[in-house]
Amino acid sequence: MAGAAAASAAAAAVASGISARPVAPRPSPSRARAPRSVVRAAISVEKGEKAYTVEKSEEIFNAAKELMPGGVNSPVRAFKSVGGQPIVFDSVKGSRMWDVDGNEYIDYVGSWGPAIIGHADDTVNAALIETLKKGTSFGAPCVLENVLAEMVISAVPSIEMVRFVNSGTEACMGALRLVRAFTGREKILKFEGCYHGHADSFLVKAGSGVATLGLPDSPGVPKGATSETLTAPYNDVEAVKKLFEENKGQIAAVFLEPVVGNAGFIPPQPGFLNALRDLTKQDGALLVFDEVMTGFRLAYGGAQEYFGITPDVSTLGKIIGGGLPVGAYGGRKDIMEMVAPAGPMYQAGTLSGNPLAMTAGIHTLKRLMEPGTYDYLDKITGDLVRGVLDAGAKTGHEMCGGHIRGMFGFFFTAGPVHNFGDAKKSDTAKFGRFYRGMLEEGVYLAPSQFEAGFTSLAHTSQDIEKTVEAAAKVLRRI
């Protein structure tokens, strides 16, 4: 997408991000069909059918707190920002999750993004079983790496070469070292509320779990690790210009989520991404899109295809592993040839490119290539967001929100929300009450106001209707 089309897409995204009645952004040419029908059991938490209880979750979680810090292996799972009992899950399938107490939920977390074709997809699972028969990890080259690399390179406009790693954090760490090695500069610029993993240099005014815990950064991060990290408010071109003027010729790269998902759902304002592209080129800095969340979700070629802006380097994760641990960073060939063993910038990983993650990624991307995928995601997600916001308006709650394709979010504030400062005006106490009420109604949302939500090809119109009905019920109650 370029020119007028890109401007139109950006305008649509902004409208959807801040309006009480968002207009769904118009998709670029879609590549995949609507989902196969899936037979599912009815939700079993309706009043009169089954009392909602999480006793087993509580028992297991209490035991976990004696074994793992806070009882979890990622902070947001502990429900610190929403209150109530963290849910311990037993199984997933399609758009549904079941906890250890037998409660069923319509899921809008999707394992934090990877489950775009639905949980435990039969085709992906069958392929994994066949790969498993040959081994779980080689610690050596395998042909599946070539296959997935070719798919990623053909899909993502900025990527001419790619390096696979094991997480989004690793991908951003590799990209950070790479841009510094290539430019010979040390400073980076990131945006308030944008989360690029838990590497030291990025834990400055980060969103996501750091925002949830109310910490501006983290103990244990030395001042030297963040002294070269500059920050600006997202969507603020003038602030970026000022930082470039004050640090002329010193900034290695600008890192950003092209659509913020770790401070809630915040789309770019018209012209913002274009301005970053121009400013980095003028100064000799690189532009890095962190597409760990948006890659293959907003379009087959990610946010950069959707908005028509090509960065120099991109990071990926989540979807390209189909639910298995994975990450990747890639970019122009001349930049990527700095990476060892082709070049002097060292980065390595024992399990990088392992056959199971490559297999899941290959078959997930194959599904996304089918005609109709992104039109379908756009429709169901738009119906969901409009339905929830309409319910909020009818019950007297100040809310705003929006979506792009299969990514969405809403805030308990009138808005508009253009940056992390705006997002923090949301009534997080009310969100907590809403969240706990939705759990009781059989809907699982991200347990933080500062996280985007996700739909999948497994979600049906009936799922959306049930969710909107549940939201209306809870909003009336709170």
From Swiss-Prot:
- Obligatory cofactor(s): pyridoxal 5'-phosphate
Tell me yes or no: is DNA-binding among this UniProt entry's keywords. no
The taxonomy runs: Eukaryota, Viridiplantae, Streptophyta, Embryophyta, Tracheophyta
In the UniProt record, the transit peptide is located at: 1-40
InterPro entries annotated for this entry? 4pyrrol_synth_GluAld_NH2Trfase (IPR004639), Aminotrans_3 (IPR005814), Aminotrans_3_PPA_site (IPR049704), PyrdxlP-dep_Trfase (IPR015424), PyrdxlP-dep_Trfase_major (IPR015421), PyrdxlP-dep_Trfase_small (IPR015422)
Q: Which GO terms describe its molecular function?
A: glutamate-1-semialdehyde 2,1-aminomutase activity; pyridoxal phosphate binding; transaminase activity
- Annotated spans, Disordered: 15-36
Which PROSITE patterns does this UniProt record tie to the protein? Answer: AA_TRANSFER_CLASS_3
Q: Which residues are annotated as modified residue N6-(pyridoxal phosphate)lysine in the UniProt record?
A: K318
- For whether the record's keyword set contains Chloroplast, the answer is yes
**Quaternary structure, from the entry:** Homodimer.
What PANTHER family is this protein classified in? GLUTAMATE-1-SEMIALDEHYDE 2,1-AMINOMUTASE, GLUTAMATE-1-SEMIALDEHYDE 2,1-AMINOMUTASE 1, CHLOROPLASTIC-RELATED
Where does the sequence pass through the membrane? none
Q: Which protein, by its recorded name, is this?
A: Glutamate-1-semialdehyde 2,1-aminomutase, chloroplastic
Output the superkingdom of the source species. Eukaryota
Q: Which family does it belong to?
A: Belongs to the class-III pyridoxal-phosphate-dependent aminotransferase family. HemL subfamily.
- Record's keyword terms, sorted: Chlorophyll biosynthesis, Chloroplast, Isomerase, Plastid, Porphyrin biosynthesis, Pyridoxal phosphate, Transit peptide
Q: Which reaction does it catalyse?
A: (S)-4-amino-5-oxopentanoate = 5-aminolevulinate
Query: What is one Pfam family matched by this protein?
Result: Aminotran_3
The pathway entry for this protein reads as:
Porphyrin-containing compound metabolism; protoporphyrin-IX biosynthesis; 5-aminolevulinate from L-glutamyl-tRNA(Glu): step 2/2; Porphyrin-containing compound metabolism; chlorophyll biosynthesis
This chain's source organism reads Oryza sativa subsp. japonica (Rice)
Q: Where in the cell is it found?
A: Plastid, Chloroplast
Q: Which Gene3D superfamilies match?
A: Aspartate Aminotransferase, domain 1, Type I PLP-dependent aspartate aminotransferase-like (Major domain)
Record-listed E.C. numbers? 5.4.3.8
The UniProt entry's GO CC annotations, sorted and at most eight, read: chloroplast
Q: Which GO terms describe its biological process?
A: chlorophyll biosynthetic process; protoporphyrinogen IX biosynthetic process
Q: What sort of enzyme, by top EC class, is this?
A: isomerase
